[in-house]
Amino acid sequence: RELVENRLVREVELTSKSISAFWGKEMKVKAAVLLPGSWYEQPGREYPVRYNIAGYGGRYTRVNRLVNDPAFFDWWRSGDAPQIINVFLDGEGPFGDSYQMDSDNSGPYGANLTEELIPYIEREYRGLGTPASRFVDGCSTGGWVSLALQLYYPDFFNGVWSYSPDAIEFENYQLVNIYEDDNEYINEWGNLRPLARDLYGDPMMTVKDFLQFENVLGWSNTYVTSGSQFSAHTALYSPKGADGLPAPMFDPHTGEIDRAVAEHWKKYDMKVLLQENWPELGPKLQGKIYIWMGD
């Protein structure tokens, strides 16, 4: 995957000290930078920075679509566009999308982002380098990641625009309450749980059907190593299992929920985070959170 050649586009490839130490080998992270139209004409100017996270598995090369769109790029180079640096983070991770957060399985992706990658980008491309000038946004997986970054690093970012995020609290993980329900696949009435619905509200697919597909994709014959959605969730939220892989929160074949693993997921449950830390977090988050979700 190559970036479009353009004087306002930069490719960042950084060897992460923290992630490399976790894995015991060289690990690199990537990003694309879209500079503002005035960047060359005002060489002494510093800029605020917007960090964008894509939907599941989205790569940093998505900047190409914007630069190759004449209407967008003509506007971007004009004086009408906001003079802000855009950074497109990369979704690649060891078990699918990295989710840009620290985890027991993928490693310290959150520390890498806030302590290595972002400081490097802001030094290299004249970002203002202050929390007040740093913003984050994304849709779907990116909606979850952007909101999590603002909540878990409240002093580092100054605002989040989160669109249609993944489940942000696990009493409603899709249609499952992982703390109380017994089975991911089957509800209390013995029916298969739907995963998605069509425009008319009718179920299109069950959770079990989707997970059977991920089980086939996984090199361990389970969704844990599929590199798909539930693989990435498991890598992020779960502890490391006895086999060295992320511990599944539910049995890949029967759907039975492991209560101990579900309890470990709590530290990534944003509702729990806010309920337990609201006196401290509330004042820091005032005016910084914007969430947009459809029906």
Residue ranges and their predicted role:
Residues 1-295:
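Non-catalytic cap/lid and distal C-terminal segments of serine-dependent acyl enzymes
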